[in-house]
Swiss-Prot record:
This is tRNA dimethylallyltransferase 2. It catalyses: adenosine(37) in tRNA + dimethylallyl diphosphate = N(6)-dimethylallyladenosine(37) in tRNA + diphosphate. It comes from the Bacteria. The gene is miaA2. InterPro entries: Dimethylallyltransferase (IPR039657), IPT (IPR018022), P-loop_NTPase (IPR027417). PANTHER family: TRNA DIMETHYLALLYLTRANSFERASE (PTHR11088:SF60). One of its GO terms (biological process) is tRNA modification. Catalyzes the transfer of a dimethylallyl group onto the adenine at position 37 in tRNAs that read codons beginning with uridine, leading to the formation of N6-(dimethylallyl)adenosine (i(6)A). HAMAP family: IPP_trans (MF_00185). Signal peptide: none annotated. Belongs to the IPP transferase family. Disulfide bonds: none annotated. Keywords: ATP-binding, Magnesium, Nucleotide-binding, Transferase, tRNA processing.
Length: 314
């Protein structure tokens, strides 16, 4: 059974559309949803990731949610293997897999069946020591000297990816980009729907979303997760919202600091949306839908369009 992937920037309505599509399909064939949001892999990271509660999932099975502790490191390779196994099992049951998320590398690794360059713990450890000693800025400069193209695509603050790029360059003797797969036919013949809308509309949604997260208890969620090991999490502690609240709490946790954390979360999410758009828009396989209008008739029309594309992929 051919999968459907629903991708796009944060706040575009992907989870809602996935539920609507699954419900529409229910009279014809059961559907199951596979998460492709890296931070929703973590147990307890609910408010800040806009994770659907069990009650909000409408009885539709969901996979790749709440599979990691916050102290564990999420990796694209591990996700790809686990999510692909979920999809294969869903197809074997005669059900439709619906992949939903906006984590760029996670989505593409799954749909393009990436193979990952080997890793060497000793080489990785040496570069991690350099990161600790020199700082992320100097290590990014080193990457720029060795592979300018890779440095241009990796944020100067993303120490983990900088270390990985330098490791791959050292092990393969080739530029980091040489190990990146090209966009080809989507695995399993997956139909890909992209949701987006005009920037002012999405910015307004992100503002409402950010305010709602803080009002619903994001700060307390971070406090609880700190007791579960959040500070030790390489990936979880860097998540948007969580990193900002953690920094505010470390600085004293006063109202002004938390207000600043809220503002930084909003602007950080806007920057992330720009990266998501840039990444996904280069994929010629995506059928884009305008998600600016959200009335009942608009939602029904998006379901119609998603199913039309899903039924006609060859």
């Amino acid at each position: 059974m051919r999968p459907l992937a629903i991708i796009g920037p944060t706040g575009s309505g992907k989870s809602q559309l996935a539920l609507d599509v699954a419900e529409r399909l229910a009279g014809e064939v059961p559907a199951e949803i596979v998460n492709a949001d890296a931070m929703q892999l973590y147990r307890g990271m609910d408010i800040g990731t806009a994770k659907l509660s069990v009650a909000a999932r409408r009885g539709i099975p969901h996979h790749q949610l709440d599979v990691l502790n916050v102290a564990e490191t999420a990796t694209v390779a591990r996700y790809q293997q686990a999510a692909a196994a979920d999809i294969e099992a869903i197809i074997a049951r005669g059900h439709v897999p619906i992949v939903v998320g906006g984590s760029m590398l996670y989505v593409q690794s799954l749909l393009d069946n990436w193979s990952f360059p080997a890793t060497d713990p000793a080489v990785r450890a040496r570069w991690e020591e350099c990161l600790a000693e020199l700082g992320v800025g100097e290590l990014h400069a080193e990457l720029a000297r060795r592979d300018p193209a890779a440095a241009a695509t990796i944020l100067p603050t993303d120490g983990r990816r900088i270390v990985r790029a330098l490791e791959v360059i050292e092990l393969t003797g080739q530029p980091f980009a040489a190990s990146a797969p090209r966009i080809g036919a989507a695995q399993w013949g997956t139909a890909i729907i992209g949701l987006d809308c005009d920037t002012p509309i999405l910015d307004d949604r992100l503002a409402v979303r950010t305010d709602s997260m803080f009002e619903r208890g994001l700060v307390e969620e971070v406090r609880v997760l700190l007791r579960a090991g959040l500070r030790d999490g390489v990936t979880a502690a860097r998540a948007l919202g969580y990193a900002q609240v953690l920094a505010a709490l470390d600085a004293g946790g006063g109202a002004e600091l938390l207000d600043d954390a809220r503002e930084q979360t909003y602007f950080g999410t806007r920057r992330y949306v720009r990266r998501q758009r840039s990444w996904f828009r280069r994929d010629h396989r995506v059928h884009w839908c305008d998600a600016g209008a959200t009335g009942p008739s608009d939602r029904a029309a998006m379901v119609d369009e998603a199913l039309r594309v899903w039924r006609h992929v060859t």
